[in-house]
Amino acid sequence: MNANEVIANRALELMGHKRGEYQYCSPNDHVNRSQSTNDAYPTAIHIGMYYTHLKLVKHFKEVIDAFRRKGEEFAHVIKMGRNQLEHAVPMTLGQTFNGFASILQDEVKNLDFAAQDFLTVNMGATAIGTGITAEPEYASKCIAALRKITGLDIRLADDLIGATSDTSCLVGYSSAMR
């Protein structure tokens, strides 16, 4: 809030008014414009995490493709399969690489599923989730603008109070990474 007051007071000076004449430029109404770190920061983190996820998946898919290529390349090389650290039955080295590719592909699906929660945001919830200091259409306008800017299917959380204190999407994604 202090930054908003500094900005408002400087604006007042530039407009020829005295500092503190907030009827002309209010720290809340004109500078802050319904923004809150309790909704803006988490929303930015969600969007940033989703973009990071997309980059990560791109690289995982490159590794999957490399495993598949090695699977084809070594399809004829026989080796001993292992079971509980002991030799088991014959298999090809190509099958081993294809197995690695399948495992990684399944993990990418898990990450994709977890990353969907990043698209649910609390923008417009303001300080505690009630949206009390924002205009009634503020949240829907923010979501529309974010969709337009990002091209992502961003959606507003059903319960803004809960979403304001909820970090489960970060915990869920971290869990999927393990």
Model-predicted segments: where are they?
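Conserved, well-structured ligand/cofactor-binding cores
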Residues: M1-R178
